[in-house]
């Protein structure tokens, strides 16, 4: 498999975690979202992915998959063990609910394209920072109430909710949103920091991570 990715992309980070948790080998193909206006906007990449976003996963059969939820769902169905979702329908729905909260209601509101549009509309950096802090804080406060009070988000092993939450926490801290108000979330962040799959997928450990 080949993963078109960017080291700091939250959506790419999710897919890297899922691949690592399942122990799947893949070739990382970095797509620089900054250099020369963004490689994702260049004809060569648009020919692969007309949406011009990362991640995109080329599977062994040659098909190119886009959008992290669809990619992760494919990985879960194609490589069911170790499972990212519970076998219990109710718990599985709760896991998907937290993943959707992060992926649909938090992340899109601080996506680079949204922040750049705010700047184009005349908002200064302090206003952009307040925008990020409002939406990230509101979303994570809800997540704090929805996840379990011990272990990972839902139990003693990482699953789909953690795959979504941990990259969001990286983004939150990068934008200056402290996690101190949310002890359950802080606990998950600490577990992830010590877990080999999450360390492997971390933005600091990617082929395109800039040198310090």
Curated annotation (Swiss-Prot):
Keywords: Isomerase, Phenylalanine catabolism, Tyrosine catabolism
A Gene Ontology cellular-component term: cytoplasm
Isomerase listed as a keyword: yes
Reaction equation(s) it catalyzes: 4-maleylacetoacetate = 4-fumarylacetoacetate
GO molecular function: glutathione transferase activity; maleylacetoacetate isomerase activity
Domain GST N-terminal: 1-83
InterPro entries: Glutathione-S-Trfase_C-like, Glutathione-S-Trfase_C_sf, Glutathione_S-Trfase, Glutathione_S-Trfase_N, GST_Zeta, GST_Zeta_C, GST_Zeta_N, Thioredoxin-like_sf
Protein name, per record: Maleylacetoacetate isomerase
Originating organism: Pseudomonas aeruginosa (strain ATCC 15692 / DSM 22644 / CIP 104116 / JCM 14847 / LMG 12228 / 1C / PRS 101 / PAO1)
Native organism taxonomy: Bacteria, Pseudomonadati, Pseudomonadota, Gammaproteobacteria, Pseudomonadales
Gene behind this protein: maiA
